[in-house]
């Protein structure tokens, strides 16, 4: 899993509440267990017209936001069914950070397991971030995980809270398997060294 340290760039604003996992990645894309290729289905019912052409008014189809790595979204993002394909699709599209006032618990945890930083802020701070994001290509956000800060285009800084374990895993690029190996590495090394001394075993 890719480490998350500092992320700088344009943030795409989506002033929509209760975006559920069905809207993040519709059911027709759930037939695969591969984590790659799902980016094309991200928000597909909002991104594309019935004929497959892009819906020009959708934020991620607009030139300023087409390559955004951060989303600023409405309350209760990721609600609905507990499909892990939702963070897979976000990650495959290139999204590394999602900021809102609240997230569904399962989605929130799945984000961290897939290298996505989900940040919870106050309604007042979210409004500031929406206003910054809506300025388009001329305004960037800088998210510093180690410092737990979001710096706006005019230099203003917001602080966010995060669980220390989640922070450690994201900073070091550790998913569940990586975390297990990281924690058990000394014991594994000791066991292998002991085996090496017992050539007859």
UniProtKB/Swiss-Prot annotation:
CDD domains on file: IPMI_Swivel (cd01577)
Gene3D superfamilies in the record, alphabetically?
Answer: Aconitase, domain 4
Enzyme Commission (EC) number? 4.2.1.33
- Report the pathway entry: Amino-acid biosynthesis; L-leucine biosynthesis; L-leucine from 3-methyl-2-oxobutanoate: step 2/4
Q: Which GO terms describe its biological process?
A: L-leucine biosynthetic process
Q: What reaction does this enzyme carry out catalytically?
A: (2R,3S)-3-isopropylmalate = (2S)-2-isopropylmalate
Supply the SUPFAM superfamilies for this chain: LeuD/IlvD-like
Its Gene Ontology molecular function terms? 3-isopropylmalate dehydratase activity
Keywords, comma-separated and alphabetical: Amino-acid biosynthesis, Branched-chain amino acid biosynthesis, Leucine biosynthesis, Lyase
Q: Does the keyword Amino-acid biosynthesis apply?
A: yes
Read off the PANTHER family from this record.
Answer: 3-ISOPROPYLMALATE DEHYDRATASE SMALL SUBUNIT (PTHR43345:SF5), 3-ISOPROPYLMALATE DEHYDRATASE SMALL SUBUNIT 2-RELATED-RELATED (PTHR43345)
**What role does this protein play?**
Catalyzes the isomerization between 2-isopropylmalate and 3-isopropylmalate, via the formation of 2-isopropylmaleate.
The entry describes its oligomerization and partners as: Heterodimer of LeuC and LeuD.
Q: Which family does it belong to?
A: Belongs to the LeuD family. LeuD type 1 subfamily.
**Name assigned to this protein:** 3-isopropylmalate dehydratase small subunit
Organism expressing this protein natively: Methylorubrum extorquens (strain ATCC 14718 / DSM 1338 / JCM 2805 / NCIMB 9133 / AM1) (Methylobacterium extorquens)
Gene name per UniProt: leuD
């Amino acid at each position: 899993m890719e480490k998350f340290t500092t992320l700088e760039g344009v943030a795409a604003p989506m002033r929509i509440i209760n975006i559920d996992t069905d809207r993040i990645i519709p059911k027709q894309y759930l037939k695969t267990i591969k984590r790659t290729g799902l980016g094309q289905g991200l928000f597909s019912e909002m991104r594309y017209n019935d004929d497959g052409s892009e819906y020009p008014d959708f934020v991620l189809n607009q030139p300023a936001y087409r390559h955004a790595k951060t989303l600023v979204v409405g309350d209760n993002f990721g609600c609905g069914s507990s499909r892990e394909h939702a963070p897979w699709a976000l990650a495959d599209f290139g999204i590394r950070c999602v900021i809102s006032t609240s997230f569904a618990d399962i989605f929130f945890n799945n984000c961290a397991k897939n290298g996505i930083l989900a940040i919870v802020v106050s309604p007042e701070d979210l409004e500031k971030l929406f206003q910054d994001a809506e300025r388009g290509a001329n305004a960037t956000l800088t998210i510093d995980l180690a410092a737990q800060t979001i710096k706006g285009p005019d230099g203003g800084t917001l602080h966010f809270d995060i669980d220390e374990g989640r922070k450690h895993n994201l900073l070091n690029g550790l998913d569940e398997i990586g975390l297990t190996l990281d924690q058990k590495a000394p014991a594994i090394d000791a066991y292998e060294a002991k085996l090496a001394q017992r050539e007859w075993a």
